Swiss-Prot record:
Residues 274-348 form the POU-specific domain. This is POU domain, class 2, transcription factor 1. GO terms for molecular function: DNA-binding transcription factor activity, RNA polymerase II-specific; RNA polymerase II cis-regulatory region sequence-specific DNA binding; transcription coactivator binding. It comes from the Eukaryota. Residues 375-434 bind DNA. Residues 1-11 have a biased composition (Polar residues). It comes from Gallus gallus (Chicken). Residues 1-39, 67-95, 253-277, 353-378, 489-553 are annotated as: Disordered. GO terms for biological process: regulation of transcription by RNA polymerase II. Its main location: nucleus. Belongs to the POU transcription factor family. Class-2 subfamily.
Amino acid sequence: MNNPSETSKPSMESGDGNTGTQTNGLDFQKQPVPVGGPISTAQAQAFLGHLHQVQLAGTSLQAAAQSLNVQSKSNEESGDSQQPSQPSQQPSVQAAIPQTQLMLAGGQITGLTLTPAQQQLLLQQAQAQLLAAAVQHSASQQHSAAGATISASAATPMTQIPLSQPIQIAQHLQQLQQQNLNLQQFVLVHPTTNLQPAQFIISQTPQGQQGLLQAQNLLTQLPQQSQANLLQSQPSITLASQPATPTRTIAATPIQPLPQSQSTPKRIDTPSLEEPSDLEELEQFAKTFKQRRIKLGFTQGDVGLAMGKLYGNDFSQTTISRFEALNLSFKNMCKLKPLLEKWLNDAENLSSDSTLSSPSALNSPGQGIEGVNRRRKKRTSIETNIRVALEKSFLENQKPTSEEITMIADQLNMEKEVIRVWFCNRRQKEKRINPPSSGGTSSSPIKAIFPSPTSLVATTPSLVTSSAATTLTVNPVLPLTSPAVTSLSVTGTTETTSNNTATVISTAPPASSAVTSPSLSPSPSASASISEASSASETSTTQTTSTPLSSPLGTSQVMVTASGLQTAAAAALQGAAQLPANASLAAMAAAAGLNPGLMASSQFAAGGALLSLNPGTLGGALSPALMSNSTLATIQALASSGSLPITSLDASGNLVFANAGGTPNIVTAPLFLNPQNLSLLTSNPVSLVSAAAASAGASGPVASLHATSTSAESIQNSLLTVASASGATSTTTTASKAQ
């Protein structure tokens, strides 16, 4: 055979021929490397197919796939020429790579035990690396000046292991992966680099290393990485060679960064985001941030809005609140901390600069921070004298108009908005202090039927000829059919005090009324208007009810008997309405615009009259909703300016007046009558005022409602209105005071 140095020269010049006879072009450290096992063409081709994507890191990198494609024909020739030379194993290997040395650092790894089969596989992999280096070297002649030294880790010297098995890289790698055997990495270094082998030995993770890539995946990933990425993705490999020394690295094991717990160099591409080391630092920053933010006068919403405008990351108030309360995840808090820190520094710097220049500079619209950070508005404080003036204005008018608010603001030298807000708050306070006495939960209050204020039509103006208009004020109350009815207060507009407050005493819900008269038959609704005038208090009361009457009396008829009513009413209305001296109740009804049908007075008590009223008479003046129902189940009593004494009540206690103005309040609360005691239509007649006076109206055989009174004094000082009951109710009581 020729000299190895002489053989390598024509091989490098031609670029083809036996790849096993190529050298690295160096004249020192010429040592033969034993290579064992015959290599067939198919095996060499399969081996090169697995390693054609290996990329070497050095001064100039080229794709191994291109170089292997260029040398595919020479590889086949190499395989053919190696077969006859393998029987003489030592001379052929000596001619293959005479200038490379294999350094085994077996003593550097403690506790590593390899079975003979694993040692054989390890050495076969070293053979594969040598062959790949030779193929790459023959394809890249410009790299011929760079030497390669392979340092591998093994438990026994290489010379003690026979190299008789053929190279089957793919199968052995799969076996090693199944056994979770972590092979050591191989590093090709310039031989002039005086490095200890221990520097290139990588301490592998335990056998359960996560994410162990297969060899095929590794070989396809390596060519896609650049030199910088290859170096950055291998934090476990530290190349301490001199700057002038070109270096190559070949990684045979999966390239993965080691856990942070191992003492390895940090990644070259460390994140630019500064991550806090532990949670304590985050807690301290969150606490400090909250204190400084409050000191600067910014809200959490201001901070989130400012970060969105200044840094492009818009955060809600909830996010800032959770950060301060440490309710975010550690990762999100780490992301948020630098932004909040930057905003806080900017806000403090701007605040300090503004304080030095002018105290109000931070609030100017020209400032960058204030444009997106609104200062918290200070609480408005009103002086005592201004508050007293506002209270006085509130007592005069609780709901002033916009012009009045402007006038008050000008007088007090205050802002109009402040005055408006004060009045609004004061009205709410008034509602809390003095809530409305009557419950407004009714679905159909009387206020919907009679708006307040409204004037009585067709009855009162014809009876009272005063110059002032008679008005009616109705407070919203529960409907009379509601079981929660306690009292119905109807107050008129009078010059006197509220002693004339009327109280309505109503029965329980009409659904339980025990009216069992078989002779009671439904009839069209009747509107009974009883107009009485009292000279003592100059009070006019109008009671409108919708009631069915018994059939023997006729349709829409009611009989009212009052012995002393004639003289009392005539005396009160003689000067005003110009009525004759013998004016009766029928005459007053006719004067009011009604159309009564008079019967012979001999059939009734003195002053009695039979009023035949058409439902349409008052229907035009009142709301149609009032006349829609044809049944009435509530007894109402309206008393003002005095009442009947408690001794004049019926013995059975069917009716009780309460809250009278002229006499002491014997009964202080409305008294509900038991529906079972309301036998209005079973007895003839029914005395609602005095049982002793009931005999006066006994001649009325078929009266459905009979009211009697023996003295004029009781009628003068009281206004009595009674309606019969027979089912559901639709009753409205209105009262007005004449001026």
